[in-house]
Amino acid sequence: MRTAEIIRNTNETRIRVAVNLDGTGKQSIDTGVPFLDHMLDQIARHGLVDLDIKAEGDLHIDAHHTVEDVGITLGMAIAKAIGNKAGLRRYGHAYVPLDEALSRVVIDFSGRPGLEYHIDFTRARIGDFDVDLTREFFQGLVNHALMTLHIDNLRGFNAHHQAETVFKAFGRALRMAMEVDPRMGDAIPSTKGVL
């Protein structure tokens, strides 16, 4: 089982993330940011990753630090659970629709953090959630999971649907990229021999 637990405490947030990359999509998520909890649930369910996330942050200011730091801590946990990437498929991609919305997500566990983020949200907030924090979450995640991530919302006019298709597609692309290919044995999926 590829599992990891990360505890990250700062002056702004206190976060614990436990992951099982070979799970079934079970989750226990409490970040204090309800819309983020809903989106993290999509990652767990569609990625078949067991997630146990507890966060306490300075929500009296706003959700920025909490959302970003959950992304950072989740990225750290994914990187730790994946380990040296021996036998890893490395690449993953998914298209996910939800009614009128359609998003594409592509992942490379390259060891080189990079985010290409293309979502033109149709409104600034989804309930109380500032949609700008979606980018902050993924930027924190890719920086610490050491992945290249391309996110494209191809269409949609309902901002909730736009966000949900992105998180569902991320979960499905993650599931594909982090699978172990038994034909590779212990080989690292790079001509360099290291990622």
UniProtKB/Swiss-Prot annotation:
Xref: PROSITE patterns: IGP_DEHYDRATASE_1, IGP_DEHYDRATASE_2
Reactions listed under catalytic activity: D-erythro-1-(imidazol-4-yl)glycerol 3-phosphate = 3-(imidazol-4-yl)-2-oxopropyl phosphate + H2O
Keyword set includes Amino-acid biosynthesis: yes
EC number: 4.2.1.19
Protein name: Imidazoleglycerol-phosphate dehydratase
GO cellular component: cytoplasm
Annotated family: Belongs to the imidazoleglycerol-phosphate dehydratase family.
Protein localization: Cytoplasm
Top-rank lineage group of the source organism: Bacteria
Entry's Gene Ontology molecular function annotations: imidazoleglycerol-phosphate dehydratase activity
GO biological process: L-histidine biosynthetic process
Keyword annotations from UniProtKB, A to Z: Amino-acid biosynthesis, Cytoplasm, Histidine biosynthesis, Lyase
CDD domains xref list: IGPD
Pathway recorded for this protein: Amino-acid biosynthesis; L-histidine biosynthesis; L-histidine from 5-phospho-alpha-D-ribose 1-diphosphate: step 6/9
Lineage: Bacteria, Pseudomonadati, Pseudomonadota, Betaproteobacteria, Burkholderiales
Listed HAMAP family: HisB
